[in-house]
Amino acid sequence: MDQDAFILKEDSEVEREAPGGRESLSDVIGFLDAVLSSEPTDIGGDRSWLHNTINTPQGPGSAHRAKSEGEGEVSTPSTQDNRSGEESRVSGRTSKPEAEAHAGNLDKQNIHRAFGGRTGTNSVSQDLGDGGDSGILENPPNERGYPRSGIEDENREMAAHPDKRGEDQAEGLPEEVRGGTSLPDEGEGGASNNGRSMEPGSSHSARVTGVLVIPSPELEEAVLRRNKRRPTNSGSKPLTPATVPGTRSPPLNRYNSTGSPPGKPPSTQDEHINSGDTPAVRVKDRKPPIGTRSVSDCPANGRPIHPGLESDSTKKGA
């Protein structure tokens, strides 16, 4: 008796621990019985009940047990309608190419705005492969209202009127250096293009405000005359022989400040100037003015000699 009671007790505990397992098995058995008991003519009937959502307290995915198996109600697992999910996937697939095409159009517009307004003979064609019209305007309207730079306007004006540059040169007006693309050549080999074809195109369009003026002979002469007026060593003192490096000055005599020996008369500036063309005039032949005496008239003993007595002695000796 005790063993039987113990076995029944264990069976009840096992049933409490795993009630879901028995319910699932019973649901499967009931579903099979209902399918087998159904008539073949009901298979082609209305199946709209299969798509109806079954509200069960046990949650989605669990089998629903019929109230009574004898009433002919079929117990089916709860399923959700997946039509909305499939439609959303299809709509997502169709919208993806449209989004890519829209992004491609935006990229084309951005590229045109970045390089818009630049025209010239060597500009790259904007047609995409097939040579047809790409749908991008050559001169798009200013939609955002941003002010355009003056460089682009000048380039457009010069490209539209190439004869204006020749008129400026004929009138003698200085030609302003402009940045941007090069203009078409007016002569053979671009010789008369004034070097525009060699200018590199810059993205920032830095404008040069200076003008190029060709110097004339009169202007060069005026510049040379102005430079001659300026002193070469302004504010610098002339170097004396004593201060010149590498030279030695002879000792000066107390009677002769020019550095010449006592028996030789001092050399003057006139002797150096006239030494090439005319014979030099010696200082000895010159007569000093009245009231003055020369340094050479003083002998070594310090006694002065009157010039008249010296001339008389020479005459008597002659």
UniProtKB/Swiss-Prot annotation:
Keywords: Phosphoprotein. The modification Phosphoserine is found at residues 68, 125, 192, 249, 257, 260. Residues 7-20, 83-101, 150-168 have a biased composition (Basic and acidic residues). Residues 50-59, 191-206 have a biased composition (Polar residues). Residues 1-23, 38-318 are annotated as: Disordered. The P/V/C gene has two overlapping open reading frames. One encodes the P/V/W proteins and the other the C/Y proteins. This is Protein W. The gene is P/V/C.
